[in-house]
Amino acid sequence: MILSYFGDGGFRLQSGDLSLLVDPPNNRLKADVVLKTLVSTEMTAPEVGEIAFPGEYEVRGIEISGIGVTEESTDKYLKTIYLVRWDEMSFAFLGHVKDVPSIDILEGLNEPNILFLPVGGGHFMSPQDAAKVAKKIEPNLIVPAFYKTPTDFLKAMGQKGREEEKLVFKKKDIITDTGKVLILKTNN
C-alpha cells in the first residue's frame, strides 16, 4: 500500500489499482473512492464514488464507517470522522475535528493501524489535545494533518517523528510500532 499527502487534510491510500482519497485539496486528484470530512449541509447528493455523510459503506472491498460529529456540525456544515478497513488494516481519519471527540466515538475507532489527526490548533484540534487523543486511541502510526509545522505536536507527543516523502508499507511493516509519529511531505 502507498500513502501520500497533499497538504491540509488531503491523503491518498493506494493498493494495486484501487485508490482512496480523503479531503482532496483540488479537483485534479482522482480516486476510486473519495471521502469528505466536511461538507455543506446544502449538498444533496455526492458525486459517484464520493462519500460525504455518516453511515456504513462498502466499495470494492473497502469497508467505511462514517461517524457524524454532531457536537461540531452546524446548520451549514456537517463534520464526519471515518474508520476505513482495507487490506486487513484499519485507518481512522479525524478530518476537520476541533474538539476531542466523545468517549463513544474514540472507543468506536478501536486502535486503528494508522490515525490521521488534525493538529494545527485554531479551527482544528490543538497539538496538546491531539496528543491526548493519539495516546488514548493507541494506533500503530500517527500522521498529523492541518498544521503549519509539526513541532508543537511532536513536543506534546514527546517524539522527534520520522519524515517521509510517502509511505510504502504492508501491515507487517507497521504493526510492531505503537504511537509512532510519521510526518509526510506534501506532494503537489
Model region roles, listed by residue range:
Residues 111-145:
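A contiguous pocket-lining binding segment that forms or flanks enzyme active sites
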Residues 1-33, 40-42, 47-114, 122-128, ...:
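Core dinuclear metal-dependent hydrolase active-site scaffold
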Residues 146-150:
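Short beta-alpha junction loops
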Residues 46-49, 151-162:
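Short, aromatic/basic amphipathic alpha-helical patches
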Residues 38, 137, 157-160:
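Alpha-helix boundary/capping residues
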